[in-house]
């Protein structure tokens, strides 16, 4: 007799559960967690969520990562390490810590609301020692990304292969370049020069490089200065080759921050400069 067929998890947060007053729940999570800036000082566009748009994106990215791990798991213990589900409830580790350095979990109960067909209903964010989790054993693990030896650190001595003209032929890439430079005749040459300058800067200041996890792969984000040295105009996503990097696409600095935040709070100055001050402080 064959075992029961595997039940696959929805990978989108709003498909997994019904969230009443989602933005207010994010406000509560921001208050629980260690203080962090969850919005940009001067956003590229006006988001619907004007208080915690970065936290919103982060939580959705974390859940998607965990749901994919759940779906790929071949053993029950590996499923439960990502997202724990049972008749009583469901939960996952948000990857964030409270102000007393306890893990923060998102907890769900079975959905019995007629307004939604989702299986789960969001109940609360809670610390790892919350009574809500007393029947959850073991607790799901904190989401972590395992990097292989070649992707643990950026190697500024490696060459960067960039086809600047090909990148700039893509309308989406071109739209991310400051408008004043988009019609610049020698833009491919300018982009090539900015990449080489970024590589040389990384030799002197390794901290300017930020890692990101994109479509299941580790990449590095390198700032590009096209119009001056006061602030980065772009970030180039570098994929890891065999002893070299491949410059595949250009991102705005704010896009780079959103991607990098899934791994950790970015510490590179060119990314930190984008942020508004945290609205709360540790008591």
Residue ranges and their predicted role:
Residues 217-281:
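Compact beta-sheet-dominated globular domain cores
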Residues 1-215:
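An acidic, glycine-rich, mixed-charge low-complexity segment common to nucleic-acid enzymes
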